[in-house]
């Protein structure tokens, strides 16, 4: 058995947070970017990769540690048809942005948590400062459900080790759940444990008063003060990648974009109860994996909930 080694708190040297995007994306940390399809989550992530690769300021004018390398794992967009053209349009240094080799076994990317070491080696070999996983559901081992708190944390735990070891910012993309109701902290797909495992969460949503404008807003940020929301829109296109235009700050907050204020519908008591029971059910299944199957009475209660 390996002994647990302990260190006195007095022996630890205080360390300030290092930022890829000051106040928003921390180096050595995991962050979430959440939103419905069609609002440009992938485009935003590629924009940040492009800015890092070329050393250009971030959308709010703040600096980044570039020029530096980035790795993009995309499970939904074709690298040749979509990823490269977008990066090029965004002004990326294409020699500094890496994707899995199409001729490799990991044509889309490694699965988590079983193949995290291959990913760790890739980050080390390329000295990457940003790792984008888009979306997280495409890169999970078979049988891993993000609706399970324990499973979600287990899948993301190796990414914490990777981020800390290489001082790399890990950006995990996910879709919103289908409820369409409730505060933003509960709108991200999967268990609340996914949010708990990451140090920051950012959400994109449409401006309710200007449908052609979308907004990036903070859901949570454990490592820095609250940051202002940023508005953006896409212009052009017509067969070519559209232009991403950042429009400055917005007064809209996350709950106004995806919660009751934005949707105009308040979560009903019955819906809230069903959501809570589903979370309890997922937690019960986690305990079953550790402590063994439930007895008959417990199983009947769970069946009644369903």
Which residues does each PLM region occupy?
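Phosphate-binding/switch region of NTP-binding enzymes
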Residues: 32-33, 38, 42-43, 130, ...
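Conserved inter-motif catalytic segment of the P-loop NTP-binding fold
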Residues: 15-16, 20-22, 26, 37-39, ...
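Hydrophobic positions on the alpha1 helix immediately C-terminal to the Walker A/P-loop
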Residues: 44, 48
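Short helix/loop segment immediately N-terminal to the Walker
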Residues: 58-65, 180, 287-296
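Gly/Ala-rich phosphate-binding loop of Rossmann-like dinucleotide-binding domains
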Residues: 53
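C-terminal regions of RecA-like/P-loop NTPase motor modules
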Residues: 4, 124-127, 165-166, 207-306
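N-terminal pre-Walker A segment at the start of P-loop NTPase domains
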Residues: 1-20
């Amino acid at each position: 058995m390996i002994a647990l080694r302990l260190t006195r708190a007095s022996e630890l040297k205080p360390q300030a947070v290092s930022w890829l995007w000051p106040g928003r994306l921390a180096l050595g940390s995991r962050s979430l970017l959440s939103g419905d399809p069609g609002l440009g989550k992938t485009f935003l992530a590629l924009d940040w990769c492009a800015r890092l690769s070329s050393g250009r300021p971030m959308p709010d004018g703040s600096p980044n540690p570039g020029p530096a390398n980035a790795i993009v794992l995309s499970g939904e967009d074709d690298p040749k048809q979509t990823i490269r053209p977008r990066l090029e349009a965004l002004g990326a240094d294409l020699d500094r942005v890496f994707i899995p080799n199409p001729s490799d076994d990991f044509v889309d990317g490694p699965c988590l948590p079983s193949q995290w070491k291959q990913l760790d080696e890739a980050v080390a070999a390329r000295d990457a400062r940003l790792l984008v996983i888009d979306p997280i559901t495409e890169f999970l081992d078979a049988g891993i459900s993000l609706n399970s708190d324990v499973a979600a944390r287990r899948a993301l735990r190796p990414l914490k080790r990777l981020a800390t070891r290489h001082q790399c910012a890990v950006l995990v993309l996910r879709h919103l759940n289908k409820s369409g109701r409730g505060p933003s902290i509960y709108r991200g797909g999967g268990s609340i444990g996914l949010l708990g495992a990451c140090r920051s969460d950012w959400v994109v949503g449409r401006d309710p008063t200007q449908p052609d404008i979308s907004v990036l807003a903070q859901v949570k940020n454990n490592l820095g003060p609250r940051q202002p929301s940023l508005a953006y829109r896409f212009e052009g296109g017509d067969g070519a990648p559209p232009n991403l235009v950042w429009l400055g700050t917005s007064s809209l907050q996350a709950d106004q974009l995806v919660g009751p204020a934005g949707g105009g519908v308040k979560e009903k008591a019955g819906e809230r109860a069903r959501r809570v029971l589903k979370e309890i059910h997922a937690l019960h299944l986690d305990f079953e994996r550790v402590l063994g199957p439930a007895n008959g009475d417990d199983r009947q209660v769970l069946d009644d909930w369903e």
